[in-house]
Design a protein with these regions (language model features):
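N-terminal secretion/transport leader regions
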Residues: 24-29, 37-46, 77-83, 101, ...
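Membrane-proximal, glycine/serine-rich, low-complexity loop/turn segments characteristic
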Residues: 20, 61, 71, 83-93, ...
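Outer-membrane beta-barrel translocator domains and adjoining extracellular loop/strand segments
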Residues: 210-212, 247-249, 284-290, 359-376, ...
Length: 878
């Protein structure tokens, strides 16, 4: 009886206790971005005291749970605190168990205590770099500091990679104002206005897919300082000086530069406007270029563009900076705005205008290696190029947890005029007009219902390229006109299911193309071929792509197998010939990733494909690309085959500032056609020969970087290797060849003492070409080194010394050394103003040369450098 009584008493007490059990839950978000905050301390404490009664921390998505026997009375509060955010307290109520809390950022101030933030912090998949830890007084833009951060790579074009992977989004305070044109921000936002740079290592930009579709791509979010928010900030720069031009006296004011950036980043709106103008060689035209795009590639992408049948442009440099050679007048302005229409809805606009006038002078000596001889061409080129470009994008985006809507209206209008005088083997004067016009609209819809997603996407674009080329020589005048135009439409829909850990999806779509091309060539011998083209091409490409993903236990596996059916309708209006065909192609792909540890990830991927027909090569008449090269197409619907396999491995220890990645990729291609070129008189006839050929590519490389905390520096080493085995038919004789390219890079930077920092960079490459038929090989090596010293003798006085050394092979067993030196000094004032004096090319070096290989061709190039320049400028940051 006693045992029965105790048992009943225990049951009653347990039931009573369970009945009183209460769970408080909720979510804590950033008041500005709306993103969930991880690691917020949530406590229950008396309203008038600090004694903690119960506590927990928020999860990765900002959610929290607190289990209580009963809700305390109204004299207790929920207390939310996190470093960098204002504390928030909410009185407890017996009627409320779910709380939605917004925390506002706030600088943490400690009386009489100096707190030094860690240079790198990690929170889940997000790595935060403290900008102040990597910046010094000589750094102006955010890009200057990004280059010093371990794991970061910033190319000369402004593209950002994190541990070897290109970023897929760039945010400013959680908003995507610039799309893929993020170098506008990195080159114009002053580093002193940025508090931190956040890297989201596995970023899924569509919130509704965050737990359904895994992404391995990183993204960057710029966190501004509180002092740079909700007010106008920016920079001003103006300067002028003298360049010692050939044949002119030194002392004439003939160079200038001006820059202005004005921006405001508030909670509900963002604005970033820039203007840059100079004739000192600095290339700012690339700031408005897309550095990434979500248009995709291949059969399921929107990347269709018209081919440039005419293409004449000044020679492009490698290794050395463009600013050493560019003789320019450049003006660029950008207007970028974003308006926050709702919690997840943004409207953004971008307008970019570029005007660039460029003079160039170069010399080249080209060798064409044939089986029975070598052909030599010499060119002395003097070119004048004028480019104008206007780009406008208007984008509406709603990115919620249940639905995603985005619509982008774009226009890209470009004008490109070139006049070029050629002396040497084939003296001539070329004049070319190459405008390009494109307008497009892209709509993306996604709806998520529990474990299911539905998408609908449509993209429509119209593009036209009316090009013309005239070539005058001592014997005749040749004229080529080409007008190509296309309407491209792509619509697809998909249905996906999330059956954890699997995601399966079926996507079906239709691409429609209607393209015309009309050309007329005169002034070349009729014996070379037909001089006119007037063709039309239409296709309707239907496809279905089953896709499946597995994501669990460190494994991420993705498989897709697009199947396409394409009827083609080709009409040669001049020949009165119609050639129609239908093709069914399959291209399965598999990718397997495994996180061996939280720091080490490996990915193996591969695929087999039948490549889509290159219908823009469907033409019969000749087209003159430049004064020397004529092209003719080939109408053939046979599909080429390809396969590839790749392996990537990456390792990171952010808090120890160690990053490493390596890759290897092998690809094979089988074609039913062989690329052919024949040397006929003054011309090279480029065409296709109906004979099967194959090629192979091998790429391998890696990079290791390590932060040097003891000297506030960085050391990195990288290596890349590229091998190509191919086949080319020259003068009706087959030539098998291979090329090898080796590239080594290294960087060492540091700030061992407060008043001195340095940066050293090394780049070495070797090109080798082998003609297998003859057993002949040729190679060249190039070495480039850069060394920069920055001194700070006084708090506001700075001195910069910069040197460059190049050792390039210009002929067999013959190298040329070139040393360039610059120096500058500046003085800063408390109001943000800075005066500087800069001397460029102190030794007044005049030429730069190197050798390159490409497709059984070896070319030695030499360029005219800008002369010694003295520039005085004033800079102001406000």
């Amino acid at each position: 009886m006693k045992q029965l009584f105790l048992y009943l008493w225990f049951i009653c007490m347990s039931t009573l206790t369970y009945a009183q059990q209460v769970t408080l839950s909720g979510k804590v978000e950033d008041a500005y971005t709306g993103n969930g905050l991880q690691g917020v301390m949530v406590t229950i404490r008396p309203a008038a005291g600090n004694r903690i009664l119960k506590f927990t921390k928020t999860q990765a998505d900002g959610s929290f749970l607190l289990s209580l026997n009963a809700i305390p009375d109204g004299r207790n509060v929920l207390h939310f605190s996190m470093m960098g955010y204002a504390v928030k307290t909410i009185p407890l109520s017996k009627d409320t168990t779910v709380y939605h809390v917004l925390l506002a950022e706030q600088a943490t101030k400690l009386k009489d205590v100096v707190v030094k933030a860690p240079s790198i912090r990690q929170r889940g998949d997000t790595i935060s770099y403290n900008v102040a830890s990597f910046a010094d007084a000589n750094d102006k833009s955010l890009a200057d500091v990004l280059k010093k951060m371990p794991g970061m790579e910033v190319s000369d074009k402004g593209e950002i990679k994190y541990n070897g992977k290109a970023i897929n989004k760039f945010y400013i305070e959680g908003h995507d104002m610039l799309g893929g044109r993020y170098s506008i921000a990195t080159n114009n936002i002053h580093q002193k206005d940025v508090g931190s740079v956040e890297v989201m290592t596995n970023h899924q930009p569509i919130k509704a897919l965050e737990d359904m579709s895994f992404s391995q791509d990183p993204a960057i979010n710029i966190k501004l300082k509180e002092s740079a928010k909700s007010r106008l900030v920016g920079t001003l720069k103006a300067g002028g000086g003298m360049e010692q031009k050939k044949g002119e006296k030194f002392g004439k004011l003939n160079v200038w530069e001006g820059e202005m950036s004005l921006m405001r980043f508030a909670k509900k709106a963002q604005s970033l406007n820039t203007f840059k103008s100079n004739n000192i060689g600095t290339d700012v035209t690339g700031e408005g270029n897309l550095l990434f795009s979500d248009d995709g590639t291949g059969v399921m992408g929107n990347s269709y563009t018209l081919k440039d049948y005419v293409n004449v442009s000044p020679d492009q440099l490698t290794d050395i900076s463009d600013s050493r050679v560019r003789k320019n007048q450049t003006h660029v302005f950008t207007i970028n705005n974003l308006w926050v229409l709702g919690k997840n809805t943004d409207l953004s606009s971008q307008i970019v205008y570029t005007h660039d006038r460029l003079l160039s002078s170069s010399f080249s000596n080209t060798q064409y290696f044939l089986n029975d001889s070598t052909i030599y061409d010499v060119e002395d080129e003097q070119a004048k190029q004028k480019q104008n470009r206007l780009v406008a994008d208007f984008t509406l985006t709603s990115n919620g947890e249940k639905a995603y809507v985005a619509n982008q209206l774009s226009a890209d209008l470009a004008w490109n005029d070139v006049m070029m005088d050629i002396a040497g083997s084939y003296p001539n004067h070329q004049q070319v007009n190459m405008p390009k016009y494109k307008v497009s609209d892209k709509l993306e819809l996604l709806h998520r219902s529990s474990k299911r997603t539905y998408t609908f996407n449509t993209y429509n674009a119209y593009m036209v390229n009316p090009h013309s080329l005239s070539v005058d020589n001592s014997q005749q005048t040749a004229y080529q006109s080409v007008r190509s135009a296309a309407f491209f439409s792509h619509t697809n829909t998909s249905l996906g299911f999330f059956l954890k850990p699997f995601t399966v999806m079926m996507k079906v779509g239709l691409q429609v193309l209607s393209r015309t091309m009309k050309s007329h060539l005169e002034g070349v011998p009729d014996s070379l071929g037909n001089m006119r083209n007037q063709i039309g091409m239409t296709f309707f490409r239907a496809y279905a792509s089953p896709e499946a993903e597995y994501n669990q236990g460190g494994w991420h596996i993705r498989f897709q197998m697009p199947i396409t059916f394409t009827p083609y309708y080709y009409n040669d209006k001049l020949m009165g010939a119609k050639e129609n065909a239908s093709k069914t192609l399959v291209a399965p792909q598999l990718s397997v990733s495994y996180f061996l540890t939280a720091r080490l990830q490996a990915t193996l991927s591969g695929g087999i494909a039948q490549r889509e027909v290159d219908e823009q090569n469907f033409y019969q008449g000749l087209l003159m690309r430049d004064y020397r090269n004529l092209y003719t197409g080939f109408v053939d619907y046979t599909a080429d085959k390809s396969k590839h396999i790749s392996f990537n491995i990456s390792y990171k220890r952010p808090l120890a500032t160690v990053f490493a990645n390596a890759y290897i990729r092998k690809s094979w291609s089988d074609s039913h056609l062989t690329v052919a070129r024949n040397f006929v008189g003054d011309y090279i006839i480029n065409s296709y020969f109906s004979n099967s050929s194959s090629s192979e590519n091998l790429m391998a490389g890696g990079k290791v970087s390590k932060g040097l905390g003891f000297m506030h520096g960085l050391v990195s080493v990288g290596f890349d290797y590229l091998r190509f085995d191919g086949f080319l038919r020259q003068n009706d004789s087959p030539s098998a060849y291979s090329s090898d390219n080796y590239m080594l890079s290294a960087k060492w930077s540091g700030r061992p003492v407060d008043w001195f920092n340095f940066t050293y960079e090394l780049n070495w490459d070797k090109d080798k070409m082998v003609l297998k038929n003859l057993g002949f090989d040729s190679s060249s090596t190039n070495l480039a080194q850069n060394l920069t010293f920055n001194f700070q003798p006084l708090k506001s006085w700075f001195i910069k010394l910069h040197g460059e050394h190049y050792r390039n092979q210009i002929a067999d067993h013959q190298h040329k050394n070139l040393t360039l030196a610059d120096a500058s000094t500046s003085y800063g004032f408390k109001n943000g103003m800075e005066l500087s004096l800069t001397a460029l090319n102190l030794f007044n070096q005049r030429t730069y040369g190197y050798t390159i290989y490409s497709g059984l061709t070896r070319t030695g190039k030499e360029y005219q450098l800008r002369g010694r320049t003295i520039l005085m400028s004033i800079f102001f940051h406000f």
